[in-house]
Amino acid sequence: MEKNEQHKSGFVAVIGRPNVGKSTLVNTLIGQKIAIMSDKPQTTRTRILCILTQPDAQIVFLDTPGIHKPRHKLGEYMVKAAEGTLKEVDAILFVVDATEKMGPGEFYILERLQATMKPVILVVNKLDLIDKEQALPIISHYTGKYSFAGVVPISAAEQVNLDSLLDEIKKYLPEGPQYYPEDMITDQPERLIVAELVREKVLHLTRDEIPHAVAVEVDEMTTRPNDDVYIRATIYVERDSQKGIIIGAKGTMLKEIGALARADIQNLLGSKVFLDLWVKVRKDWRDRDGILRNFGFGEER
């Protein structure tokens, strides 16, 4: 087989304020649900590496927590993880929501981009939710504030213009061989992905302060002789009242969380799953360094 001398490989940070569709975009591009999705801000808490391998290029996406002004130690960790990613990559995707006006969150990020020498591509997402004539003024508003290397309007949900986005990204990647095996799509351990899928269901089914106060850990994950997978996971919250909400009347909420999470986990693992969920209280865990370290925050995972 003739070697492709023009093959490119590189790392691309995906940044933006919370809830602009970063994880939806990455999941769609790699064709697998790795980063969890929710309409709640600060859904992504850690840097997630997702790998797209094509004949001419391997693009390693780093899906980052939304950059925002932190209100607690967990928030400080999330922003540090997002901003630290910018130093390691070949290009940056700045994802914005076409349905919302440019606000303080975008200005906050643009200030931080001024310090980077990396090419920044403006990705205007949710194009399917606006009229076409509305796109140009939105783009002009952003390009008037920053000198972007490229601009690509897309719809991640409807898979509109994603090939154009990939072509734009490849312009800024260095030539070189693949960093990762062709069949590898993430560096995330299965346990971590499973924990995130459980947390995603909590985000979907609860509201108010609950989503931000939740952490999930997989305590046990074993394959049984019949190839079924047994998983025991603990959902941590900060208050007894939150624990009651997660469990629900006669355990109904916890059962619904488990049923929805189990379906996604079975798709991920390709095996029948027995999911055993527990709920525990760790008071004010988001502001306690020791607990944050136990949950894997504040260090590279």
Which residues fall in each region the model found?
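Active-site glycine-centered loops adjacent to acidic/histidine catalytic or metal-binding residues
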Residues: D63, N125, S155
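P-loop NTP-binding site
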Residues: E190-R301
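Conserved G1/Walker A P-loop phosphate-binding module
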Residues: M1-E88, V96
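Catalytic P-loop NTPase motifs of RecA-like helicase/translocase cores
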Residues: T44, I67-K69, K101-M102, I130-D131, ...
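Conserved glycine(s) of the Walker
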Residues: G21, N161, M253
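Conserved C-terminal guanine-recognition region of P-loop GTPase G domains, centered on the G4
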Residues: T53-Q58, K80-V151, T222-N226
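Conserved, well-folded catalytic cores of nucleic-acid-processing
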Residues: Q32, I51-P55, P70, T85-I92, ...
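Canonical P-loop GTPase G-domain recognition
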Residues: K118-P119, D128-T186, E190
